[in-house]
Amino acid sequence: FTKSKLTVLEINPQVINIAKHFFRLPKESSRFKIIEGDGINYIASTDCKYDLFLSDAFEEYGLPETFCTLTYFESCKKILSDDGIFVINLWGSDPKTPIYINRIMDVFNQQVFYVQSDKPGNIIVFGFNYLLPSLKESAVKKKLKLLERKFNLKLMLYFNRLIKNSSIHPSDNALFNKE
């Protein structure tokens, strides 16, 4: 990712300081920019297009309601490139989470999947600004096994977790085709 550019938005200066001091947040550069300010205002006013937009906006008591509105999701879609991806971290125990997922599905024309952690907690939702391809499950597994050997990673373990804990199920999802 040597050509990647990263912009981070954070409204709380204390969070930025903690990240710098305890999480080795890199210094700003031509490829890495930190904006201290309101993310919603930034999204509404920017002309930039992003290939990937991550939203992780928790407060002391959970996700602020303004980051779960149809307007917010539409604004996020608007700043994506044609092949951009929106990712949001939701809280699984919030009774409104299914409503938020449905809003994201509406905004992204059903081109969405989500992954739940093994234990109740976070739900990561992916919204795609393009039509998802239809994949053959066996071809995906074959490629993952090759990559496992090449990189000494347990990719099949993660693939199986993804299938188990996500909205993607090869047997009934358009993302996967059985042979």
Can you say where each PLM-predicted feature lies in the sequence?
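The AdoMet/dcAdoMet-binding core of the Class I SAM-like
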Residues: 1-82
